[in-house]
Curated annotation (Swiss-Prot):
Superkingdom per UniProt: Bacteria
Region entry Disordered, spans: 287-312
Protein name according to UniProt: Peptide chain release factor 1
One example GO MF annotation: translation release factor activity, codon specific
Xref: PANTHER family: LD18447P (PTHR43804:SF7)
Record key words, sorted: Cytoplasm, Methylation, Protein biosynthesis
PTM remark: Methylated by PrmC. Methylation increases the termination efficiency of RF1.
Gene: prfA
Length: 359
């Protein structure tokens, strides 16, 4: 890992020289790229300095502990060593994660689709809980969220919820949320106190950049229908034909949007989702053809694959793909997802590039 850090520090010096060149401002695209790289490398530098300083303090405490005789000071030093070892482990993992080579698509916005699966009303309620969890996580990362479509259930929660999320490294941290999320808990309507199991399916679709030439949709291939939007239970919320349904005839992909009162806005949102789904279908097709890469993925990313279990009675969350079990489900549901998403990103990196690169 030290070799990687030294390479990054050397590159940071080069980037700083390039950014300080007044001529760089004549090329906004290059300046933007260098600025992002500078921010990433600076974060690595700061993390490395924190790790080195913490290791030094730990080393000093251990040295003092080896010669100290006073029981009170010994106890204090032992506590310091324990805290120091935990800090070194945490900072090492943080630095290791920062050293993961960035994917060109890491900063792509994503469209996240959550749907109630088995479990009826309880599944719909858990969709609502997951929506809240992802909104809190996004807020903690400084990301922006936008509701694209929402279909409420009769008892609260959502039958389906589609949102766009944008910001730095959105795709990197959210791409492995795709799959089936299983929940085990006692529903509020359960009078016997029995634990019920229900499920929510999640799809994460990277949103194509505006200049992405891979996604081309011919207007001739689209069928666009308009109709009156309606709320939960079929109650009309708009007397005009503002809702939009777009069908991509070649692929059969259908997208409906009725959240906005403007037909134009609903069409724009539906087109965003349509493009993301078509792009995702192409990516999935290529991934299936590249069998070597598939073996290194954290699961298939298929929404039918059970990836995680949320057990509320035990306050336990388990990610089945990497065998990670945590007993702080309450914190996870409050948006503290980094402990899971970071572990997944690190696992994939080790699988693809080998542990020796970051060890």
């Amino acid at each position: 890992m030290e070799i990687k850090v030294l390479e990054c520090l050397k590159r940071l010096e080069e980037v700083e020289k390039q950014i300080s060149d007044p001529n760089i401002f004549s090329n906004p695209k290059e300046y933007s790229s260098l600025s992002k790289e500078h921010a990433r490398l600076s974060e690595i530098k700061n993390a490395h300095e924190s790790l080195v300083a913490t290791k030094k303090i730990l080393q000093d405490d251990k040295l003092a502990l080896s010669t100290e005789k006073d029981p009170e000071i010994v106890a204090m030093l032992e506590e310091g060593v324990l805290v120091g070892e935990e800090a070194v482990e945490r900072l090492s993992k943080q630095l290791e994660n920062l050293l993961i080579p960035p994917d060109p698509d890491d900063d792509l916005s994503v469209i996240m689709e959550l749907r109630a699966g088995t479990g009826g009303d309880e599944a719909a309620l858990f969709v609502g809980d997951c929506v809240r969890m992802y909104h809190l996580y996004a807020a903690s990362k400084g990301w922006q969220c936008e509701v694209l479509s929402a279909s409420e259930s009769d008892l609260g929660g959502y039958k389906e919820y589609v949102m766009g999320i944008s910001g730095a490294s959105v795709k990197r941290f959210l791409q492995y949320e795709a799959g089936t999320h299983r929940v085990q808990r006692v529903p509020e309507t359960e009078t016997q106190g029995r634990v019920h199991t229900s499920a929510v399916t999640v799809a994460v679709l990277p949103e194509p950049a505006e200049d992405d030439e891979e996604v081309f949709i011919d207007e001739k291939d689209l069928r666009i229908d308009t109709f009156r939007s309606s709320g939960a239970g079929g109650q009309h919320v708009n007397v005009t034909d503002s809702a939009v349904r777009i069908t991509h005839i070649p692929s059969g992909v259908v997208v409906t949007c009725q959240d906005e009162r403007s037909q134009h806005k609903n069409k724009a949102k539906a087109m965003r989702v349509l493009k993301a789904r078509i792009r995702d279908a192409e990516v999935q097709k290529r991934a299936q053809e590249a069998s070597a890469m598939r073996s290194a993925q954290v699961g298939s990313g298929d929404r039918s694959e059970r990836i995680r279990t949320y057990n509320f009675p035990q306050n336990r969350v388990t990610d089945h793909r990497i065998g990670l079990t945590l007993y702080n489900l309450d914190r996870v549901m409050e948006g503290e997802l980094d402990m899971i998403t970071t572990a997944l990103v690190t696992h994939v990196h080790r699988q693809l590039f080998g542990h020796e690169e970051t060890a």
